[in-house]
């Protein structure tokens, strides 16, 4: 379900000393859907923290785009900002594009960003099939194992369960 073409833009600014945000997300695209996720987090005060984990899967001819930017302004010393985007391409015609950025104007910070795009591990698929798990079920299980990290970071138990059910229904 969902729109064929969608853009989701998140903008967060840390205006208070010691502000913290966890801005995670996941996407699961199929058909010819195109999703553009844009995230901009600005640290303007000191001792702020950002933790962002985005994971996604593109199947069929779907296209996913992630543009993430963390900006640490002058005077925002003590900032700890982490951004990760990891995606799976689940068909030959699917596409994932990613552009993670860190822009740092302060000196005393701990910041990191990372991006990976790949496919399911063929040896893991083979291993599961050799133990009697059908290929489609093995793909679904490995995809769920890849994405579940984002869901496990949801603090509210009820919301976490709803997200797990949502994911299971779509795999």
Go through the PLM ranges and name each one.
Residues 1-126, 130-133, 147, 154-171:
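Conserved beta-strand/loop scaffold segments within soluble protein domains that form the structured core
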